[in-house]
Amino acid sequence: MARKENTFQSELIKEIKERFPGAIVLKNDSGYLQGIPDLTVLWKQYWALLECKRESKAVHQPNQDFYIDLADSMSFGRFIHPENKEDILNEMERSFKIRR
């Protein structure tokens, strides 16, 4: 059984802060801007938008794909769920370090 999205998100925030010391992780309000990804990660001069899903097959809400693609074209944007979490965080780590 898949974990609740908010449980996954809380654990993810802790892991991001461990992997990226000093990172600021902001929870975004989709009520303010429909489809904006759940999390903004700020670390040094880098940033990422991450949309948390409880599982890989979870439905994408309106505009989520647009904002993930836009963020990725500017910096880093991904859908993240328990099955791909390690791959995405590793990719984010590589992406941030490459741009130093």
Name each region found by the language model.
Residues 1-100:
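Catalytic phosphate/metal-binding cores of nucleic-acid and nucleotide-processing enzymes, i.e., regions
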